[in-house]
Amino acid sequence: MTIGRAKVYATLSKIFYHLFYDEAIPKDCREIIEKFGEIDFNLRSVLVRELRGSVLIKDMPQSLAEVYESVMKDFYERYGFQASELHADHIAVELAFMSKLVEREISLAQQMKEEELYKIRAAQHRFIKAHLQPLVKNLPSAPLLNFVRDFVREDAKYLYSSLVGEKNEGADNN
Protein backbone atom coordinates (compact mmCIF):
# COMPACT_ATOMS: atom_id res chain seq x y z
CA MET A 1 0.00 0.00 0.00
CA THR A 2 2.75 2.49 0.94
CA ILE A 3 4.73 2.38 -2.32
CA GLY A 4 1.46 2.98 -4.16
CA ARG A 5 0.66 5.97 -1.96
CA ALA A 6 3.98 7.66 -2.73
CA LYS A 7 3.51 7.10 -6.46
CA VAL A 8 -0.06 8.45 -6.47
CA TYR A 9 0.92 11.59 -4.52
CA ALA A 10 3.93 12.20 -6.79
CA THR A 11 1.87 11.62 -9.93
CA LEU A 12 -0.92 13.95 -8.83
CA SER A 13 1.66 16.61 -7.98
CA LYS A 14 3.22 16.30 -11.46
CA ILE A 15 -0.21 16.55 -13.08
CA PHE A 16 -0.97 19.81 -11.27
CA TYR A 17 2.46 21.23 -12.13
CA HIS A 18 1.81 20.48 -15.81
CA LEU A 19 -1.68 22.00 -15.62
CA PHE A 20 -0.29 25.08 -13.84
CA TYR A 21 2.07 25.72 -16.75
CA ASP A 22 -0.51 24.76 -19.42
CA GLU A 23 1.58 21.78 -20.50
CA ALA A 24 0.35 18.41 -21.71
CA ILE A 25 0.05 15.80 -18.98
CA PRO A 26 2.60 13.01 -19.57
CA LYS A 27 1.14 9.69 -20.67
CA ASP A 28 2.68 7.78 -17.74
CA CYS A 29 0.93 10.12 -15.28
CA ARG A 30 -2.41 9.64 -17.01
CA GLU A 31 -1.99 5.86 -17.02
CA ILE A 32 -1.25 5.67 -13.29
CA ILE A 33 -4.30 7.71 -12.29
CA GLU A 34 -6.59 6.04 -14.85
CA LYS A 35 -5.91 2.70 -13.12
CA PHE A 36 -8.38 3.97 -10.51
CA GLY A 37 -11.05 4.62 -13.16
CA GLU A 38 -11.61 6.91 -16.09
CA ILE A 39 -10.64 10.45 -15.13
CA ASP A 40 -11.27 13.59 -17.14
CA PHE A 41 -8.12 15.71 -16.85
CA ASN A 42 -9.74 18.78 -18.41
CA LEU A 43 -9.66 21.56 -15.83
CA ARG A 44 -10.20 24.51 -18.13
CA SER A 45 -13.19 25.58 -16.06
CA VAL A 46 -11.00 25.67 -12.97
CA LEU A 47 -8.24 28.19 -12.50
CA VAL A 48 -5.41 25.80 -11.60
CA ARG A 49 -3.31 28.69 -10.34
CA GLU A 50 -5.92 29.35 -7.66
CA LEU A 51 -5.82 25.82 -6.18
CA ARG A 52 -4.24 27.14 -2.98
CA GLY A 53 -5.22 26.86 0.65
CA SER A 54 -5.07 30.60 1.31
CA VAL A 55 -7.42 31.19 -1.63
CA LEU A 56 -9.88 28.30 -1.28
CA ILE A 57 -10.30 27.78 2.46
CA LYS A 58 -13.29 30.01 2.98
CA ASP A 59 -13.31 30.13 6.78
CA MET A 60 -9.62 31.10 7.04
CA PRO A 61 -9.25 34.44 8.83
CA GLN A 62 -7.51 37.11 6.72
CA SER A 63 -4.75 37.44 9.31
CA LEU A 64 -3.94 33.72 8.91
CA ALA A 65 -4.20 33.85 5.12
CA GLU A 66 -1.45 36.48 5.10
CA VAL A 67 1.03 34.22 6.96
CA TYR A 68 -0.25 30.83 5.76
CA GLU A 69 2.43 30.41 3.11
CA SER A 70 5.28 31.03 5.55
CA VAL A 71 3.70 28.57 8.01
CA MET A 72 3.64 25.99 5.23
CA LYS A 73 7.28 26.64 4.31
CA ASP A 74 8.32 26.24 7.95
CA PHE A 75 6.48 22.92 8.15
CA TYR A 76 8.15 21.72 4.95
CA GLU A 77 11.62 22.74 6.14
CA ARG A 78 11.15 20.75 9.35
CA TYR A 79 11.07 17.65 7.15
CA GLY A 80 13.81 18.73 4.74
CA PHE A 81 11.43 19.59 1.90
CA GLN A 82 12.11 22.64 -0.25
CA ALA A 83 8.96 24.16 -1.76
CA SER A 84 9.11 24.83 -5.49
CA GLU A 85 8.64 28.12 -7.27
CA LEU A 86 4.87 27.73 -6.82
CA HIS A 87 3.13 29.06 -3.72
CA ALA A 88 3.80 26.79 -0.74
CA ASP A 89 0.07 26.27 -0.24
CA HIS A 90 -0.59 25.26 -3.88
CA ILE A 91 -2.04 21.79 -4.27
CA ALA A 92 0.88 20.63 -6.45
CA VAL A 93 3.35 21.52 -3.70
CA GLU A 94 1.28 19.96 -0.91
CA LEU A 95 0.93 16.72 -2.90
CA ALA A 96 4.68 16.68 -3.62
CA PHE A 97 5.36 17.13 0.10
CA MET A 98 3.10 14.19 0.95
CA SER A 99 4.95 12.09 -1.62
CA LYS A 100 8.26 12.91 0.12
CA LEU A 101 6.83 12.04 3.54
CA VAL A 102 5.60 8.68 2.24
CA GLU A 103 9.00 8.03 0.62
CA ARG A 104 10.62 8.72 3.99
CA GLU A 105 8.14 6.30 5.57
CA ILE A 106 9.20 3.59 3.09
CA SER A 107 12.86 4.17 3.91
CA LEU A 108 12.24 4.00 7.67
CA ALA A 109 10.20 0.81 7.27
CA GLN A 110 13.03 -0.80 5.29
CA GLN A 111 15.47 0.20 8.04
CA MET A 112 13.01 -1.12 10.68
CA LYS A 113 13.11 2.14 12.63
CA GLU A 114 9.75 1.69 14.36
CA GLU A 115 9.75 4.81 16.54
CA GLU A 116 10.65 7.13 13.64
CA LEU A 117 8.17 5.29 11.42
CA TYR A 118 5.35 6.07 13.84
CA LYS A 119 6.43 9.73 13.97
CA ILE A 120 6.51 10.13 10.17
CA ARG A 121 3.07 8.53 9.84
CA ALA A 122 1.79 10.87 12.54
CA ALA A 123 3.31 13.82 10.64
CA GLN A 124 1.56 12.70 7.46
CA HIS A 125 -1.77 12.42 9.26
CA ARG A 126 -1.28 15.83 10.92
CA PHE A 127 -0.41 17.44 7.58
CA ILE A 128 -3.43 15.93 5.86
CA LYS A 129 -5.81 16.98 8.65
CA ALA A 130 -4.37 20.49 9.12
CA HIS A 131 -3.52 21.46 5.54
CA LEU A 132 -4.36 19.08 2.72
CA GLN A 133 -7.90 18.07 3.73
CA PRO A 134 -9.11 21.65 4.31
CA LEU A 135 -7.74 22.52 0.86
CA VAL A 136 -9.22 19.57 -1.03
CA LYS A 137 -12.61 19.81 0.64
CA ASN A 138 -12.88 23.34 -0.83
CA LEU A 139 -11.86 22.33 -4.36
CA PRO A 140 -14.45 22.94 -7.05
CA SER A 141 -16.16 19.88 -8.50
CA ALA A 142 -14.33 18.31 -11.45
CA PRO A 143 -13.46 14.63 -12.03
CA LEU A 144 -9.73 14.99 -11.31
CA LEU A 145 -10.34 17.18 -8.26
CA ASN A 146 -13.00 14.78 -6.97
CA PHE A 147 -10.46 11.96 -7.30
CA VAL A 148 -7.90 13.97 -5.30
CA ARG A 149 -10.48 14.73 -2.61
CA ASP A 150 -11.46 11.04 -2.32
CA PHE A 151 -7.85 9.82 -2.34
CA VAL A 152 -6.79 12.22 0.43
CA ARG A 153 -9.84 11.32 2.54
CA GLU A 154 -9.12 7.59 2.21
CA ASP A 155 -5.42 8.10 2.91
CA ALA A 156 -6.26 9.97 6.12
CA LYS A 157 -8.42 7.01 7.18
CA TYR A 158 -5.63 4.57 6.32
CA LEU A 159 -3.09 6.58 8.32
CA TYR A 160 -5.41 6.91 11.29
CA SER A 161 -6.07 3.16 11.44
CA SER A 162 -2.34 2.50 10.99
CA LEU A 163 -1.47 4.86 13.86
CA VAL A 164 -4.14 3.45 16.17
CA GLY A 165 -3.02 -0.09 15.34
CA GLU A 166 0.63 0.71 16.05
CA LYS A 167 -0.26 2.42 19.32
CA ASN A 168 -2.31 -0.59 20.44
CA GLU A 169 0.49 -2.99 19.46
CA GLY A 170 2.95 -0.93 21.50
CA ALA A 171 0.63 -1.08 24.53
CA ASP A 172 0.33 -4.87 24.14
CA ASN A 173 4.12 -5.24 24.20
CA ASN A 174 4.52 -3.32 27.49
Swiss-Prot record:
Monomer. It comes from the Archaea. InterPro entries: DMSO/NO3_reduct_chaperone, TorD-like_sf. This is Tat proofreading chaperone TtrD. It comes from Archaeoglobus fulgidus (strain ATCC 49558 / DSM 4304 / JCM 9628 / NBRC 100126 / VC-16). Keywords: Chaperone, Cytoplasm. Belongs to the TorD/DmsD family. Its main location: cytoplasm. The keyword Metal-binding does not apply. Signal peptide: none annotated. The lineage of its organism: Archaea, Methanobacteriati, Methanobacteriota, Archaeoglobi, Archaeoglobales. It is found in: Cytoplasm. One of its GO terms (cellular component) is cytoplasm. Binds specifically to the Tat signal peptide of the TtrA subunit of the tetrathionate reductase.
